[in-house]
A protein has these predicted regions:
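Conserved alpha/beta enzyme-core scaffold
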Residues: 1-220
Length: 220
């Protein structure tokens, strides 16, 4: 099955009120072309964004933030994003700040169909507010619920037409786990090859998790 689609077809899967996962961290592995297409070619809004850092200065995600397109942001690090800091301080956006390890495990648990993550991280801090707790062998843990998206934008170096992906180095980051934790997964790839041209040992994300592929650099 050939899963290659246009950017126009890809962004049509995001609607007003969607829960959108975006892979990458601090410019590494960011599917910026998909986000920019969503920003410039649609008017969707009230999106809940699940992203490690919600973009850096002048990134497509930050530009969407400044346009007020996100209703809520769930992430781990907002220190490099002045726009989200501004909106949080103004009270014009909902946000959930999650410890980075917990963030990844919550996504992984969604992909595995689990009911959540049990972790000591955040006990006794603001992170624990409003969350269910459990005591195991005299130690207190938080029960963190899974994080799942309706649509995920991820990025790969190489994809084959069936959706097998190759990711390189630290660009793997959250892209790998988000591929397993969304209802519809779209990969932006720098190169697309015929099915069978990627050595199975080189596959980072198998095609079973990928619903669509777009080629980076193509016009919308």
């Amino acid at each position: 099955m050939n899963k290659v689609i246009s950017k126009k077809e890809a962004i049509a899967h995001v609607h007003d009120g969607s829960v959108l996962m975006v892979g990458g961290f601090n410019t590494s592995g960011d599917p910026n072309e998909l986000v920019e297409a969503l920003r410039t070619k649609t008017s969707v809004k009230n999106i809940t964004l699940i992203s490690t850092d919600s973009g850096v200065t002048d990134s497509p995600l930050t530009n969407m933030l400044s346009e007020g397109r996100f209703k809520k942001v769930i992430g781990t690090f907002f220190g490099a994003n002045k726009e989200i800091q501004k909106r949080v301080n103004e009270g014009t956006i909902e946000y959930e700040l999650v410890p980075q390890g917990t963030f990844v495990e919550r996504i992984r648990s969604a992909g595995a169909g689990l009911g959540g993550v049990i972790t000591p991280t955040g006990v006794g801090t603001v992170v624990a507010e409003g969350k269910q707790k459990i005591n195991i062998d005299g130690r207190e843990y938080l029960i963190e619920k899974p994080l799942r998206g309706e649509v995920a934008f991820i990025r790969a170096e190489i994809a084959d037409e069936s959706g097998n992906l190759v990711m390189i180095g630290n660009a793997k980051n959250t892209n790998t786990v988000m591929a397993m934790a969304a209802d519809f997964v779209i990969a932006q790839a720098n190169q697309i090859v015929k099915t069978g041209e990627i050595d199975p040992d080189d596959v980072t994300v198998p095609s079973i998790y990928v619903d669509a592929i777009v080629l980076a650099g193509e016009e919308i």
